[in-house]
Amino acid sequence: MNGRFGKFGGQYVPETLMNAINELEVEFNKAINDEKFMMEYKYYLEKYVGRETPLYFAENMTKNLGGAKIYLKREDLNHTGSHKLNNALGQVLLAKRMGKKRVIAETGAGQHGVATATAAALFGLECEVFMGAEDVERQALNVFRMKILGAKVNSVKSGTNTLKDAINAAMRDWVTNIDNTYYVIGSVMGPHPYPTIVKDFQKIIGEEARKQILKAEGRLPDYVVACVGGGSNSMGIFYPFIKDEGVKLIGVEAAGLGIDTPMHAATLTKGSVGIIHGMMTYVLQDEDGQITPAYSVSAGLDYPGVGPQHSYLKEKERASYEAVTDKEALKAFLYLSEKEGIIPALESSHAVAYAMKLAPSLSKDEIVIINLSGRGDKDVNTVMKNMEENKNGK
């Protein structure tokens, strides 16, 4: 593990963090090669998270769109309502193994914060979550969930008051409390070894989906579609298909109010190579290399960077990345709810929206898998507000 995907990745961190990061790499490698650790992890995935999650044939949607067969990988059915617990559980288990008494995490939509607080409660560790002040407001329900689970939530008032600033605050805390604290990063980002750790704990999604589609259809899918913020749900489903050249991988970013406006989070579509949060990757930045704010209706996608392995897949042309606007995502949110009785997270709705455009252009014997990364309970308020604003002609 040299921590590079082509030129992307690396460890752009202060000297004070290098020891902790090196220790983490050593301990992680020991853990994943330790049968006892992996058995314990798999036990909790099955009995606590509720894996495996179904691969569901979306018959109504398929008929209605009149093209490819659409399958949904139901990560929304995991305990805590998204794919996030796959990773939080693995990392908190690792923290416990390393003898750390306290875990910290950053969170945007609040899903990773809830997942980390959940795992910390399960394994008896102290938990503190950093969240941008704006996200605290947007995701009040998740903030309360974290507090119920015994976590302390810090509202971060700096920069844009969103995920990027929460990560900065969490990294500062980690530097200060390195001896007793483990930093649970929520996506395939940050300095090496984090992108690999998170990918290894999320690839269960794609491993299951690959087996399930072979069982259901006797062959691999033509397309796998997933939303991309930092990129962990997408990397989790993409990774086991990377070697299958016939499977097209499509990551869907947030186009916000449009990629030709400054109000979007389409890092791979509109960004350029730079350094953020300890890694070299695509970032949204100005001519001077200053990070520009990311925006999306979905709190989980408004990140101005992206996991380095996604940057690598883009450059190698192994995956392609598209962008979907707030409006299209909101439409897809309602569409899936009405057609299949499944309320998706606004993040996942971006993937659904792209698949709604893709499927009708394909033949009836082609297969599309959408990673439904989370459920939409947390977003009902946001959607309600948007519908009211549209009614009032805003």
Swiss-Prot record:
Pfam families: PALP (PF00291). InterPro entries: Trp_synth_b_CS (IPR006653), Trp_synth_beta (IPR006654), Trp_synth_beta/beta-like (IPR023026), TrpB-like_PALP (IPR001926), TrpB-like_PALP_sf (IPR036052). Its cofactor is pyridoxal 5'-phosphate. One of its GO terms (cellular component) is cytoplasm. Its EC number is 4.2.1.20. The modification N6-(pyridoxal phosphate)lysine is found at K84. It comes from the Bacteria. One of its GO terms (molecular function) is tryptophan synthase activity. Belongs to the TrpB family. The beta subunit is responsible for the synthesis of L-tryptophan from indole and L-serine. Tetramer of two alpha and two beta chains. This is Tryptophan synthase beta chain. The gene is trpB.
